[in-house]
């Protein structure tokens, strides 16, 4: 007497001759023998059918259905489901296997719980027979039990990668037949052909349960899994994954009427669609030569709107953003008329970057542009927002939501160009720049420090910026040497612009009075934040110690707020510790007229910064007739042709003290330095910032603002690269709270090797540096 099967195993195959025998053997080893195996040969051209027939001759539980034309595994499964004789169905791919107790355990769970779906674990095995733990963990069931609409919501959560593998579940057969009736009968899906079935089955199922046992053995890189993309035609094949999700959309209308939250179904569909787009673009970095990126992206954009591509990458495959930045089509500044400008930063503060942004807003409004200021975070100080500018604080939670909000702002405010001040301070800016580019809006990015700052900080920001600056229409730096640095890294669309004058500088412009040399006590002043990492206020104390040793009668007033390493009280305590209280006064912040009085009372502005981008404090002091004594930063624009500055090499406090003493004692020399200071400050204020910003937006800056690199530029960059690498290492090694970096020699050699690749003409010099090390 024929015993009806409890479970039908659907085995769609196409040219699986090498593996199908193993698959069938795993079926025949089942501990519960009440099953049937429905093999569907999808027009194989090898010996797949012959292998199946040999097993069929041995065991009547094996059935074979032949399809005359290849219709993909989607049609193979359809044929198998329609022919299945059991109440429940399992799926097995021709290059995989079942665990021996797969039928027994999955069927028992379904019967005991009356579930429509039973999930179970998967063993993922690589070609060497080793377990692929990460993927195996991602395939493990998350939920123990789900009912009603929660079945779908749990299996296809919004914002997560859509998982459509049918072989992870046991299904009620009637559920699958209902699903196939919702889709076109002639549908062919070469890629991800299980997703529409899984998606709709989850939407129709009313009860789901799971077991943790790994009942399926998935062999990674067998068959069609995990292979590289060799050409554009192969990428076009993988692009078919998007068809697999988009074919679902017409079927959703019949499901929304029965759901408590129909919008959730649509959100999950859109999320699954983004997931499949991400699946496709993931090949750009994992399985493809970069030479193919451009052509493959062009093909992708014929199928998928560019904003969806960016959102998919941001949500699921952020590692692809660099490929989108370098291989996508860059929008040039000035390609379209500009009427509406968006200025953006993290949050508006009283700091220098916000000051630049607010000055830009003022100049652009004055020139007739519409200006929108967008803060990415809350708690902005709005006092300085000029009248006529619209301020928006972003509210989205999570990067994908904020990128979507960014797109909405660009559309609603009809933005023509974006100026982003966050390039050096955030690693999320490429997501926003790429979304804007996808909408046809170019982004201009500002780098507010010297290009070698990441070398000093000992981080990978240089590589990150090099990989992503292609997303910008223009990269704006603060000096000609910065332009050379980034152009030598392949970022051709680089310019420099001066920073706009600060309110203090504008107030002082034209009012400077030549100062006389000191006739008694030498008054020195410094102002800024007490940032030991960058501005080195402790070096001021070293200079003060040297001046005391030289028996100079002086007083140094240190003005500014505390920072990470020093509060005002901390620095004052250090002054006491060094016995400098008679000479150094740490007074905290001073603003407005109080700061101006302090500057006017000084004979010299002393600055010991180790790195700066522009340093407007130089011009602010010189505008009041106060000369400058400083550690050298020769690339700074305010330093160029400035005869009101005394500069010594970095870290040489003794030399700086001697220069200060000598300048104070030479009345005629001091007078000439004061006169030169006023002249230099006047030059800084002569830039027509309004015209420069308009030329920037129009892509029409004069060539002088984007000079080509010279060999001398490269030599300077090399010298400063070694200096910052060595100094950054030494400072890092001196701080026990930091993890120990690599040896200094190794670090500098890596910098040298990188520099050789960037500056081939300097190879002999760099080789000498390496030999010396």
Regions found by a protein language model. Give the residues of each.
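Nucleotide-activated donor-binding/catalytic signature segment of Leloir-type glycosyltransferases, i.e.
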Residues: 569-589
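A short, active-site helix/loop in glycosyltransferases that binds the activated sugar's phosphate group
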Residues: 470-495, 501-505
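Conserved acidic donor-binding segment of nucleotide-sugar-dependent glycosyltransferases
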Residues: 645-653, 662-667
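Aromatic "clamp/platform" in nucleotide-sugar-dependent glycosyltransferases that forms part
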Residues: 610
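Donor-binding/catalytic cores of nucleotide-activated saccharide
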Residues: 94-211, 216-235
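Glycine-rich, basic loop-to-helix element that forms the pyrophosphate-binding segment
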Residues: 67-84
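Conserved donor-binding/catalytic core segment of Leloir-type glycosyltransferases
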Residues: 340-344, 515-535, 541-544
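Glycosyltransferase donor-sugar binding loop
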Residues: 373-379, 527, 555-570, 588
């Amino acid at each position: 007497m024929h015993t009806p099967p409890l479970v039908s195993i659907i085995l769609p195959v196409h040219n699986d001759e090498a593996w199908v025998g193993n698959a069938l053997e795993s079926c025949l080893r089942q501990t519960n023998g009440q099953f049937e195996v429905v093999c569907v040969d999808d027009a194989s051209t090898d010996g797949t059918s012959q292998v199946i027939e040999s097993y069929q001759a041995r065991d009547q539980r094996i059935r074979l259905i032949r399809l005359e034309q290849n219709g993909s595994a989607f049609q193979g499964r359809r044929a198998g489901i329609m022919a299945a004789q059991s109440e429940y169905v399992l799926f097995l791919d021709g290059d995989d296997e079942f665990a021996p107790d797969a039928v027994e355990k999955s069927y028992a769970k379904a019967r005991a719980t009356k579930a429509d779906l039973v999930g179970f674990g998967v063993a993922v095995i690589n070609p060497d027979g080793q377990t692929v733990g990460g993927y195996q963990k991602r395939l493990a069931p998350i939920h123990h039990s789900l009912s009603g609409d929660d079945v779908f919501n749990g299996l296809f959560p919004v914002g997560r990668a859509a998982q459509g593998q049918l072989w992870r579940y046991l299904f009620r057969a009637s559920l699958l037949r209902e699903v196939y009736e919702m889709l076109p009968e002639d549908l062919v899906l070469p890629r991800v052909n299980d997703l529409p079935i899984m998606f709709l089955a989850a939407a129709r199922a009313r009860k789901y349960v799971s077991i943790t046992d790994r009942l399926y053995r998935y062999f990674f890189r067998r068959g069609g899994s995990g292979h590289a993309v060799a050409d554009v035609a192969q990428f076009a094949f993988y692009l078919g994954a998007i068809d697999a999700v988009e074919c679902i959309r017409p079927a959703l209308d019949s499901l929304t009427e029965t759901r408590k939250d129909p919008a959730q179904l649509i959100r999950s569909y859109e999320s699954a669609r983004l997931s499949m787009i991400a699946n496709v673009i993931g090949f750009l970095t994992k399985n493809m030569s970069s030479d193919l990126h451009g052509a493959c992206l062009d093909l992708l954009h014929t199928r998928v709107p560019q904003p969806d591509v960016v959102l998919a990458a941001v949500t699921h495959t952020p590692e692809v953003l660099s490929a989108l930045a370098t291989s996508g089509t860059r929008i040039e500044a000035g390609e379209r008329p500009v009427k509406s400008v968006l200025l953006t930063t993290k949050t508006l503060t009283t700091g220098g970057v916000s000051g630049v942004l607010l000055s830009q807003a003022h100049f652009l409004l004055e020139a007739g542009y519409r200006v929108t200021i967008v803060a990415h975070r809350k708690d902005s100080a709005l006092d300085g927002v000029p009248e006529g500018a619209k301020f928006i604080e972003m509210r989205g939670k999570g990067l994908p939501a904020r990128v979507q909000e960014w797109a909405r702002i660009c559309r609603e405010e009809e933005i023509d160009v974006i100026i982003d001040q966050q390039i050096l301070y955030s690693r999320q800016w490429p997501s926003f720049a790429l979304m804007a580019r996808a909408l046809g809006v170019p982004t201009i990015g500002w780098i507010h420090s010297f290009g070698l700052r990441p070398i000093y900080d000992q981080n990978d920001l240089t590589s990150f910026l090099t990989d992503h600056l292609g997303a910008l229409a223009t990269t704006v730096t603060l000096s000609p040497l910065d332009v050379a640095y980034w152009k030598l890294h392949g970022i051709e669309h680089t310019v420099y612009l001066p920073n706009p004058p600060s309110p203090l500088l504008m107030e002082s412009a034209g009012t400077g009075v030549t100062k006389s040399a000191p006739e008694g006590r030498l008054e020195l002043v410094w102002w800024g934040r007490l940032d030991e990492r960058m501005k080195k206020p402790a070096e001021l104390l070293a200079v003060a110690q040297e001046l005391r040793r030289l028996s100079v009668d002086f007083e140094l007033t240190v003005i500014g707020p505390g920072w990470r390493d020093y509060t005002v009280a901390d620095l004052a305590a250090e002054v006491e510790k060094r016995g400098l209280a008679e000479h150094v006064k740490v007074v905290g912040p001073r603003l407005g007229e109080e700061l101006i009085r302090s500057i006017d009372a000084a004979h010299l502005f002393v600055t010991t910064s180790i790195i700066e981008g522009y340093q407007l404090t130089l011009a602010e002091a010189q505008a009041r007739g106060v000369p400058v004594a400083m550690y050298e930063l020769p690339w700074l624009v305010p330093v160029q042709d400035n005869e009101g500055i005394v500069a010594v090499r970095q870290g040489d406090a003794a030399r700086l003290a001697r220069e200060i003493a000598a300048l104070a004692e030479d009345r005629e020399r001091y007078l000439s330095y004061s006169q030169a200071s006023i002249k230099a400050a006047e030059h800084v204020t002569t830039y027509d910032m309004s015209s420069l910003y308009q030329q920037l937006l129009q892509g029409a800056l004069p060539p002088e603002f984007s000079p080509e690199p010279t060999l001398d530029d490269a030599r300077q960059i090399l010298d400063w690269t070694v200096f910052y690498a060595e100094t950054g290492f030494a400072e890092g090694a001196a701080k026990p709270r930091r993890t120990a970096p690599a040896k200094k020699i190794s670090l500098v050699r890596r910098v040298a090797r990188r520099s050789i690749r960037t500056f081939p003409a300097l190879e002999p010099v760099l080789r000498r540096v390496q030999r010396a090390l």
